[in-house]
């Protein structure tokens, strides 16, 4: 059986992540319209899956973020203006990758403080991006407050999921590093077995 190339592996992984984002975002948005109908809040899985993708694939995380934003707007019956604000404003999430210029991605998995900082910065950059994209239509500082407040449940959900998933092997890990690690472990295991007479 022919082995996958790194590029093929990345494409498959990103496709799965985007499909998961689309399905769960549609379910969450549809459910929120009933459960949170009297509250100025929504819950989204897009932030969670985008954070996981950023750790795994860096800037390719723009894919699930765009998909999630598009599906949210589609299911919630958004206007063209809202499509623009959410789909393009959410791309500001990538600014939180600057955190990894100073801190190892491994810290997201091992340190709660770093994990919280990473998710919070991603969340805030998304809110700021949406606000900036809304400025051509309406200049108001109240808008950014609304963006931050309405998605607060999504922030909490993302922190909880990433904390629960931190021990899942390879899930919250840079995939290039992960593949190199498991290949090294495989070689070491083969060497150990070759010296074992039994």
Tell me the role of every PLM-derived stretch.
Residues 63-85:
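Membrane-helix boundary elements
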Residues 48-50, 89-98:
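Alpha-helical transmembrane segments and their membrane-interface exit regions
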Residues 21-22, 94, 155, 159:
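Alpha-helical transmembrane segments
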Residues 52-66, 104-106:
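Membrane-helix interface "capping/anchor" motifs
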Residues 22-25, 69-70, 90:
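Residue-level recognition of pore/gate-forming positions within transmembrane alpha-helices
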Residues 1-56:
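Hydrophobic transmembrane alpha-helices
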Residues 8, 59, 69-70:
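Seven-transmembrane-like multi-pass membrane architecture, highlighting hydrophobic TM helices
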Residues 30-40, 79-89, 99-198:
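Membrane-embedded alpha-helical hairpins and interfacial helices in multi-pass inner-membrane proteins
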């Amino acid at each position: 059986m022919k082995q996958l190339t790194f590029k093929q592996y990345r494409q498959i992984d990103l496709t799965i992540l985007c499909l998961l984002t689309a399905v769960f975002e549609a379910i969450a948005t549809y459910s929120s319209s009933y459960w949170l109908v009297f509250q100025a809040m929504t819950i989204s899985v897009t932030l969670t899956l985008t954070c996981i993708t950023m750790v795994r694939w860096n800037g390719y995380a723009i894919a699930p973020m765009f998909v999630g934003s598009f599906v949210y707007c589609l299911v919630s019956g958004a206007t063209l203006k809202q499509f623009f604000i959410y789909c393009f404003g959410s791309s500001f999430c990538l600014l939180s990758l600057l955190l990894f210029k100073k801190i190892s991605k491994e810290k997201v998995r091992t340190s709660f403080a770093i994990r919280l900082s990473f998710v919070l910065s991603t969340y805030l950059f998304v809110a700021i991006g949406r606000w900036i994209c809304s400025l051509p239509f309406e200049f108001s500082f109240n808008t950014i407050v609304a963006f931050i407040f309405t998605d607060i449940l999504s922030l909490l959900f993302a922190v909880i999921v990433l904390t629960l998933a931190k021990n899942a092997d390879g899930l919250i890990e840079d995939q290039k590093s992960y593949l190199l690690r498991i290949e090294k472990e495989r070689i070491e295991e083969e060497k150990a077995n070759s010296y074992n007479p039994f």
